[in-house]
Every structure is written in structure tokens, then in C-alpha cells.
Amino acid sequence: MFYTIILTDTQAIFAYSTQAGATEKFHSEMAYAMNQGISCTCVVMDNFGAVYRSEHYTAPMEVAEEE
């Protein structure tokens, strides 16, 4: 069994599946975070805690325009 863990500033999502399913969830959640401008960390690991994939995305900070 493989696990996908997604952490954002406001929530934690935990899902489990086959390796292919967990990797697909990883890619879909990272794409969603990037499209929404949400910082997140995604990890895919197995039953023994071995990490197969880990990635962090930091959303760009909005800069207020000076007047």
C-alpha cells in the first residue's frame, strides 16, 4: 500500500492506494495547488515509511502596488 500526504497552510489530506494511484494523486494535488496559488508539500511513501516522491511548492507572494 502506498500513501499520499498533502499539507497546505489550511488543511492536511491523506489518501492511500497502489503506487500508481498514489503517484497520480500526488500529481493532481500539486497541479491543483499551483493553479490555485496555494503553497503545499506532497509526499508519496510506502507502508515502511520509505519516501518515493516528495515535492514542495511555494506560491509566489503578491506584491501590493505602490501609489
Predicted region positions:
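A short, compositionally biased N-terminal segment around positions ~18-40 that is enriched
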Residues: 19-37
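A short, exposed loop/beta-hairpin motif centered on an aromatic-Gly-Thr core
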Residues: 8-24
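Serine/threonine-rich low-complexity intrinsically disordered regions
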Residues: 7-8, 18, 59-60, 64
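Short aromatic-glycine-(Arg/Gly/Cys) micro-motifs in beta-strand/loop hairpins
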Residues: 1-12, 38-39
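Compositionally biased, intrinsically disordered low-complexity regions
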Residues: 7, 12-13, 50, 57
